[in-house]
Amino acid sequence: MQAASLAFHPPALHTSPSYFSSKLPHHLNYSLFSHTPPTSTLSLTQTLSRKSICQPRAVGKYVREDYLVKKLSAKEIQELIKGERNVPLIIDFYATWCGPCILMAQELEMLAVEYENNALIVKVDTDDEYEFARDMQVRGLPTLYFISPDSSKDAIRTEGLIPIQMMRDIINNDL
């Protein structure tokens, strides 16, 4: 009697371009099974110009003396909130190690120039003022509070990086 020989042969992998990859632009048409890197249609000058756009513009420390948006303590912020104001107050809760906070700082500086006499923009370092940030229910960074000079209006709270146009809309329409 002869023993039956059982051999397992895995199915062959299909390496020809699939329907979906043939619909991709030719510089994105890349098979997972090929050993050649994808080709790019970008020229060297386009690649270099994209890199220069993405380079960080800020040099030096995060908070500088010449910034319009000033870093305040918890006590100073509480005095501003309770005090008499005729302009909206925007409070930025940030951390120096937070990438989105650094991007938001640049946008807030632009807003401070734009709304120089029409809004007061300040910032609080959550590492320095941990208890105050906790009391203000700051859970994610950056967190902004928009506080109207009219005490009958509720404060508006945002969390995360938001576009500068959204900040303008909140200042112009909701405060």
From Swiss-Prot:
Keywords: Chloroplast, Disulfide bond, Electron transport, Oxidoreductase, Plastid, Redox-active center, Transit peptide, Transport. CDD domains: TRX_family (cd02947). GO terms for molecular function: disulfide oxidoreductase activity; protein-disulfide reductase activity. PROSITE patterns: THIOREDOXIN_2. The record marks 99-100 as: Contributes to redox potential value. The record marks 92 as: Deprotonates C-terminal active site Cys. Belongs to the thioredoxin family. Plant CITRX-type subfamily. This is Thioredoxin-like protein CITRX, chloroplastic. It comes from Solanum tuberosum (Potato). The lineage of its organism: Eukaryota, Viridiplantae, Streptophyta, Embryophyta, Tracheophyta. The gene is CITRX.
